[in-house]
Structure formats: C-alpha cells, structure tokens
C-alpha cells in the first residue's frame, strides 16, 4: 500500500510544499519570516472574522460597536488587540522578509519577487482600510487625508476621490465600502500567497551564499518545521507581551475620540508601519510630486532586479554593498521617526534629506558599490 501522504491528490500537494520539499541545508533564521507571515495572515483572518461578527459598519454605531466588543463580548478585548497588534507583527515580518530578499539577492527570482511586491501593496491597502473601521478621530482624518491625495491626479482626480468616498466627503458610504474591502482583501492575499509559493517552489529557495544548492538539499520536515516553530514561539511571545502589557503602545490616543468632521487633530499621522512612506510624501512641497514619491517609494522595489550589477548574487561576501544596505535600513528608521513628528524645523529638512538619501541609495549607491566590487575582484 502506497503512503497516503504521497498518493492522495490533495495531501500530495501539501506534502510536496511543506514536508518532502527539498530545501538548502544552510538557510539561516532570516528565512523563518515567510512562515511567520503565513501564521500572521491566518491569525488576522481568524481574529478579524470574530470581530466582524460584532462590528457594525455604520458611522453612528461603528465606534460604539468597537467599545461593545472590548467591554461586553467574551474575550472581545483580547481579540481586538490581537488583531490590531497582529497587524504590527505582520508588518515587522514583512519588512524583515523584504530586507532579507534585498540582502541575499532573492529578487533574481523575478516572478516570486514581483508577486511579493503586489502582496506588499495589497497588505498595505488592507491595513489602511482596517485602520478606518473603528471610526475614531485618526481613522476619519487619516481616511480623509490619504484618499484626498488622489485628487492630485490631473483631470480625473476630484471625480476619482468622490467616487471612492461615495459622496462629497468621507461618510457612511466610505465606511461601508472600506469594511467590505477590508473583509475580502485577506482572501485575495491568501490566493496571492499561494501563487507566491507556487513560483518559489518552481525555482527552490535561495540561500545565504547565493550560489545554487541543488547538490546539497535536505527535507523541509523535520529540519525547517522545527526551526519555524521556534520562530513562531518567539513571535507569539512578542505579540502576547504587547497585547497583554501595553496593547495601545503602537496605537494613537486620538483614536479613542469618536470621529468628528468639525474638529481636526493637531497631528494627523497613519499607523507606524506607514510612517516612512508618509515622511517621503510630506518632504515634497508639491502635492502631485509627493504622491508620486509615495508610490515610487514602494514600486522602486520592482526596479531592484534591473539595478543588480554585481557578479555575485548575495551580499554575504560584499562588504561595500553591506554598508549601503545598512545605511538604507538606518535611513528607513529615520524616515519612520520623522513621519511621526510635526511638520516644523528641523524635522522637515531631516525628512527631505532622508528621502533624497533613500532614493539615492537604491538608484545610485547600490549599483555603484556592486560595480566597484566587481572591479576589485579582478585584482
């Protein structure tokens, strides 16, 4: 009798993807974040489903329905905070996952990389719409400011904004459609994740050295399942510490005030994971220019495979490129800090310099460092 794991049409697919999958023998802990992202997605879908059972997407009752979840629903508070802080964990894992792809040259798997960029954009859109749902002050004004950016598009801008709003301002129609999209998008993300994995398993995983590892593969289970479980336990520890000790650490106090279109908060800012892009947007005094810079700050990832000039795939043996990479990480942290600061001196000039540096590092210094390293190889 053949093993059901290898003969059953459905179980066979799971077996080839997670059990008997040949994996490089030397992949480090930086490769844990793919599985952690999968866990985060499952957590977000499950907690989101339970929240949706009690949430009402109406401007008059949305805020009080979230309060009701926290006060009256059994363990509603923990579900709500797991969902809110789970999004933060999701983005931490996402940024590390993208950073690892950059560092070790995983972007040479073009299809996997491009699907990954689409996934990043979709997750960002989902998180933005989710932030609007509690209908607090920052929810309302965040939605107003960010959707209003589309009015910078020549000719069709204003019509487009009113079409998204479903009226002449952010109101009931906007909240209802954002809830609908926020509910459906995670399932679209799940489908994209499957495509992402499909393309990855066509080529096999990259590894820290960046050289082909076909001659030295080990089965995914038990080696990497155990390794991933360790990463998962650390993620759960971090998430539960955040949820149980300081659930509002990463939130905004303004969101505990019900939305009021007549009162603008002193500092409108998005969640922490969007602050780097928000800082780039604010650093350009022109509206359309700012919007373009905002979009390019993410889409520039699609250019990275084209800008790869090195003869080596990974940065493991390229100290100059490593310096540029860590400068980029420091620059992104600076942008994140600046995005949360008020628009005044000296933050404005720091933000502008950090934005110029961000694009310069990717477009100029990374290819330049690679070219210098190529020439050094000849010596």
From Swiss-Prot:
| Family matches, as PROSITE patterns | CYTB_CTER, CYTB_NTER
Q: Where does a ubiquinone bind?
A: 201
Keyword Lipoprotein recorded: no
Q: Where in the cell is it found?
A: Mitochondrion inner membrane
For this protein, the record's SUPFAM superfamilies field holds: a domain/subunit of cytochrome bc1 complex (Ubiquinol-cytochrome c reductase) (SSF81648), Transmembrane di-heme cytochromes (SSF81342)
Q: Which cofactor does it need?
A: heme b
Keyword list (alphabetical) reads: Electron transport, Heme, Iron, Membrane, Metal-binding, Mitochondrion, Mitochondrion inner membrane, Respiratory chain, Transmembrane, Transmembrane helix, Transport, Ubiquinone
May I ask which residue range the UniProt record assigns to the signal sequence?
A: none
A Pfam family cross-referenced in the UniProt record is Cytochrom_B_C
| Key word tRNA processing present | no
Q: Which Gene Ontology BP annotations are present?
A: mitochondrial electron transport, ubiquinol to cytochrome c
Q: Which GO terms describe its molecular function?
A: metal ion binding; ubiquinol-cytochrome-c reductase activity
Membrane-related topology note: Multi-pass membrane protein
The UniProt note on the cofactor reads as follows: Binds 2 heme b groups non-covalently.
Please list the residues that bind heme b b566. Answer: 97, 196
Q: Name one GO cellular component term.
A: mitochondrial inner membrane
Job description of the protein: Component of the ubiquinol-cytochrome c reductase complex (complex III or cytochrome b-c1 complex) that is part of the mitochondrial respiratory chain. The b-c1 complex mediates electron transfer from ubiquinol to cytochrome c. Contributes to the generation of a proton gradient across the mitochondrial membrane that is then used for ATP synthesis.
Other comments? Heme 1 (or BL or b562) is low-potential and absorbs at about 562 nm, and heme 2 (or BH or b566) is high-potential and absorbs at about 566 nm.
Q: How does it assemble?
A: The cytochrome bc1 complex contains 11 subunits: 3 respiratory subunits (MT-CYB, CYC1 and UQCRFS1), 2 core proteins (UQCRC1 and UQCRC2) and 6 low-molecular weight proteins (UQCRH/QCR6, UQCRB/QCR7, UQCRQ/QCR8, UQCR10/QCR9, UQCR11/QCR10 and a cleavage product of UQCRFS1). This cytochrome bc1 complex then forms a dimer.
Name under which the protein is recorded: Cytochrome b
Lineage start: Eukaryota, Metazoa, Chordata, Craniata, Vertebrata
